[in-house]
Amino acid sequence: MTNSIDGPKGWQARAAAWELAALSFRYPGAELAGAVASGEWAEAAREIAGALGLALPKGWADDVRDVELHALRAEATRLFVGAPEAACSPYEGVWRAKAEGVQPLLFVNPHSMAVERFCKSCGLGRPEGTNEPLDAVWTELELLEYLALRAAADAMDAAAENDLAAGGDGAPTEEQAEQYKEIGDEIDEFDTEDDGPEPGDVVASADLPGGSPEAAWDEFMADHAKVWMPQFAEACEADSRVPFYKQAASLLAAFIK
């Protein structure tokens, strides 16, 4: 995303964008199927896009609601798992290997390993109970969500400090306090879901890559997400036989610009 939105609300909108995108590409469950069928998914996408200053085409996602969970799962399997290979691999290492003209290998390729090191430097590890590469599109999107939440929290702290410096009391309004709690609760969820080296501990902002959540977010976007996700989104939109995945891919493409 290259829009100029900043501040706590801007970072919260970015976090919401990545959260929705990650949910869209993970193996579908009842939560996703229900949100798609009810129209909640498309409504959330439009709201988030609007908050980020992005315009979705008229009639976007009008055709996604008439789909059942079994159809989503069948298409997700065909696209992202496949036999003998996925129609549209969800792994950065595979896309980067193809671009470099080398044999793609899961886990043991330089790009997958770089993503794993980056996650660890942010205090995050492989989601508990899983053994999948950390360069899966949904995992990378969740990392970006986490960094955006951290940036939102830091922006609120900075606003309070600026208020104090200007002679105010630094106390948040009721709305700001509720916003801060919401951000904190979402950050805490990451500590309970991964098996990082220090479960329950959050890496200090100054110790994140680049010295801040914003810098870490920019670095991961430049070195990883923007390098391969546009091509992944384009392929997914072209290859999918189910309208939902076509629209999810077009949404990811809009978010990643």
What do the PLM-derived regions correspond to, one by one?
Residues 1-257:
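Surface/interface-facing alpha-helical segments and adjacent flexible terminal/loop regions used
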